[in-house]
Amino acid sequence: MNRLEVTEKIISTKVTKGIKWEAVAKKVGLSKEWVTAACLGQMTLNAEQAKIVGKMFGLTVEEQKWLQVAPYKGSLPTLVPTDPLIYRWYEIVNVYGSTIKELIHEEFGDGIMSAIDFSMDIVRQPDPKGDRVNVVLSGKFLPYKQY
């Protein structure tokens, strides 16, 4: 048993039972974005959260324990993602990454945007030309220190 197997079981059960991430998030009491990341193996659940997720997805006690282990975050199976939607994000960073970096540095100074003190919100934005995906990323600015 390992974390990847637990993630695969969660995805399989989600499909067969028609479970929505929003429903899981409501039961856990956190955002759909964070809970989805946790269920996909990218975040760590506490014991209570793992028990709730375990009940929804029919996980054993051992499988629930795996949800409480700190994962290897950002561990995609290939260097360049092949899934079209994930690849678009890769492409966005390749095209706009230097622009984002320049504008953040111009506004805040030399530093980084945290992915630890971080939140995101994904919503559908109706548009007569075709609905749009509205993604808001919010990370704390962390300046580099001098020493």
Swiss-Prot record:
Keywords: Lyase. The active site is at R88, E91, S114. It catalyses: cyanate + hydrogencarbonate + 3 H(+) = NH4(+) + 2 CO2. InterPro entries: Cyanase (IPR008076), Cyanate_lyase_C (IPR003712), Cyanate_lyase_C_sf (IPR036581), CYNS_N (IPR048564), Lambda_DNA-bd_dom_sf (IPR010982). Signal peptide: none annotated. Pfam families: Cyanate_lyase, CYNS_N. GO terms for biological process: cyanate metabolic process. One of its GO terms (molecular function) is cyanate hydratase activity. CDD domains: Cyanase_C. Its EC number is 4.2.1.104. It comes from the Bacteria. Catalyzes the reaction of cyanate with bicarbonate to produce ammonia and carbon dioxide. NCBIfam families: cynS, PRK02866.1. Belongs to the cyanase family. This is Cyanate hydratase. The gene is cynS.
